[in-house]
From Swiss-Prot:
Gene: dnaJ
UniProt-listed Gene3D superfamilies: DnaJ domain, Heat shock protein DnaJ, cysteine-rich domain, Urease metallochaperone UreE, N-terminal domain
Cofactor note: Binds 2 Zn(2+) ions per monomer.
Taxonomic source organism: Campylobacter jejuni subsp. jejuni serotype O:6 (strain 81116 / NCTC 11828)
GO MF entries: ATP binding; heat shock protein binding; unfolded protein binding; zinc ion binding
Subcellular location: Cytoplasm
Binding partners and assembly: Homodimer.
Stored Pfam families: DnaJ (PF00226), DnaJ_C (PF01556), DnaJ_CXXCXGXG (PF00684)
Protein name: Chaperone protein DnaJ
Family from the record: Belongs to the DnaJ family.
InterPro entries, alphabetized: DnaJ, DnaJ_C, DnaJ_domain, DnaJ_domain_CS, HSP40/DnaJ_pept-bd, HSP_DnaJ_Cys-rich_dom, HSP_DnaJ_Cys-rich_dom_sf, J_dom_sf
HAMAP family: DnaJ (MF_01152)
Domain description: The J domain is necessary and sufficient to stimulate DnaK ATPase activity. Zinc center 1 plays an important role in the autonomous, DnaK-independent chaperone activity of DnaJ. Zinc center 2 is essential for interaction with DnaK and for DnaJ activity.
């Protein structure tokens, strides 16, 4: 069964124009190709969303569709317009009508020819071991940066001379049709500038920049963690005017087989023998700095957590130190010798367990038996 235009936009048949427009905006943003590159299913849904909107936003088409169905719209002068929106030049224009100038039309989104071909800043990833991140270290980083080509002044063109891009006619964007809609994409030939080199610069091969290698030693602070960034001043790319941006080092810290880190706190699961849990004993547990004493209370339970204050990680921005949380896992013997078995049987009897049943268990059975009798 073919899905209806109302179902495609997830609205009811009684929806007014404003509701239809809001629904279209939501669905178009969700399935837009720029957000779902390489996703064929999203591309197909995007086409359906636009098809549904073109019909339901037009009173005449909607009336015909409601009365006779989709087939009645084929032919008879009810085909799609050249743009698919009748009055909107491209997707940027309709988004602009919804959201304001931030989305802009193609003419407003053209890049300036004075724009840099390279960003001033860039990011490099740095992998650290668990200990390196927790305690800090020194690291040498080799990196590649870009320098705006002096020969062509960063244009990528021989002698720095550019001409109007023939593909987009200087607009910086080209129209791409998908079903009922024609939307604008950045021109692949000029990358949105509207200008292109007729002859490439021999020094930078038309890129507008040259690459160089460098290295720097970094002091990694104690307590750094995955996702954090360190800024290295004046180690970024070099622009046309000679200014140099910054390099940002993004940290990727490895996990540990024993300790689990959560911000500045450390978690560890530690095995405890059942007699230690019952009697309550002082035990030694490992920490990231060595070991610490944990005083177990009598009758400690499996999975119970205990906090060792200031045995965690130092906060990277202050002198505060996190805690270590120890979760105990109570262990029982899997095999017993004759002497151990005899001792445990005597212990069991001393707790009033006879005929394999404790007094509390007997009481529960009696309670259930009385329940059946009533």
């Amino acid at each position: 069964m073919e899905i209806s235009y109302y179902e495609i936009l997830e609205i009811t048949q009684s929806a007014d124009k404003e509701t239809i427009k809001k629904a279209y905006r939501k669905m178009a943003l969700k399935y837009h190709p720029d957000r779902n590159q390489g996703d064929k299913e999203a591309e197909d849904k995007f086409k359906l969303v636009n098809e549904a909107y073109e019909v339901l936003s037009n009173d005449e088409k909607r009336a015909i569709y409601d009365r006779y169905g989709k087939d009645a719209l084929k032919g008879g002068g009810f085909g799609s317009s050249s743009s698919g929106f009748g009055g909107f030049e491209d997707l940027g224009d309709i988004f602009s009508s919804f959201f304001g100038e931030g989305f802009g039309s193609s003419s407003r989104r053209r890049k300036s020819s004075n724009d840099e071909k390279i960003p001033s800043d860039f990011i490099v990833n740095l992998k650290l071991s668990f200990k390196e991140a927790v305690f800090g270290c020194k690291k040498n980083i080799d990196f590649t940066y870009k320098c705006s080509c002096k020969t062509c002044n960063g244009t990528g063109a021989k002698d720095g001379k550019l001409q109007t891009c023939p593909k987009c006619q200087g607009r910086g964007q080209v129209g791409v049709s998908q079903g009922f809609i024609t939307f604008a994409q950045t021109c692949p030939d000029c990358q949105g500038s509207g200008e292109k080199a007729s002859e490439k610069c021999s020094d930078c091969k038309g890129l507008g920049y040259n690459e160089s290698k460098d290295s720097v030693e970094l002091n990694i602070p104690e307590g750094i963690d995955t996702g954090m960034k360190l800024r290295v001043n004046a180690k970024g790319n070099i622009l046309k005017n000679g200014t140099r941006g910054d390099m940002y080092v993004k940290i990727i810290a490895a996990e540990d087989d024993t300790f689990v880190r959560d911000d500045d706190d450390i978690y560890i699961e530690f095995p405890v023998f059942f007699t230690q849990a019952i009697l309550g004993q002082s035990i030694k547990v490992p920490t990231i700095r060595g070991e610490a004493t944990l005083n177990l209370p009598k009758g400690a339970k499996d999975g119970q957590r205990f906090v060792l204050e200031k045995e965690g990680v130092k906060d990277v921005h202050s002198s505060r130190i996190g805690n270590q949380i120890v979760q105990i896992s109570i262990k029982f013997p899997t095999s017993l010798n004759d002497e151990q078995k005899e001792l445990l049987e005597k212990l069991s009897e001393s707790f009033g367990i006879k005929d394999g049943m404790h007094q509390e268990q007997k009481g529960l059975f009696e309670k259930i038996a009385n329940w059946f009798k009533s």
